[in-house]
Amino acid sequence: MKSVLFLIPLVHAGEVVWDGFFNSSFTADQLDKWSWSNPVGPYQWYIHGSEATANYLEVSADFKNPADESDEKGIRISIDDTSSWNGQTMMRSELIPQTDADLGSGTLFYHFSLQSRRKTRPLRPLSIKLPSSRYFILSYSYTFPSHFTELKYGGDEETLRWLADGKTQWSTDLVAGTWYNFAYEIDFSAKTVGLWTSTGAEALKKVVEPVSAATQTDSKDWHVGELRLDNGQKGGKEDWFWSGVYIEKGEITTAIAGPAA
């Protein structure tokens, strides 16, 4: 009898080069162990305000996309009127991957899922007279404050926008309670950025073909979190919820379950 070989398709396709997944025992205070002299854990945590870490970060199984099977917990990243970092007028709560991996060569896919909630959803603009009052959500910058790709929310509308080199390439209404899944397709050689996205448990689909962008990095430039331009006014506290944060090369993993499923 001839043997029969069954080929079982893999759930994921690419090779993970870095991940920010949280296991069941991880707590937010573990991020306080990181320092320039003690670079431990998945993230650098130094861009934040003057309050304790618990004011800005919390991890919980309730904070992840239920379709994400690679994380056991998601993370709440909050921003408020204490979130000035180093005396800046902008408010910031941001995590940066802690890794020695090369995050700036070839083509890489930068994955994450994002949600706002009705009770803690981002505020409307502080004033319609302040069109620059907006949020930079998960940006990629080499020369701050320019971002070669980023999500933005706010201004004079409740729209979530994706930009490349400062130009809007995709947008959608931000609906509280909806999980938005993204992957930035960054080709550092061709200097282009494309976008894959979906909602809930739906598989990622490419919605923007690669467009030109000033892609450059020293592998320390991916900011996971929020930057708010308050222009000196009070903005209150807002929460965003994140899960499924990882970077891969090769073929893209489109399943929201992620590479560990």
PLM region spans:
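Beta-strand initiation motifs
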Residues: A203-K205
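Localized edge beta-strand/strand-to-loop motifs within extracellular or lumenal beta-rich domains
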Residues: V175-G194, T199-G200
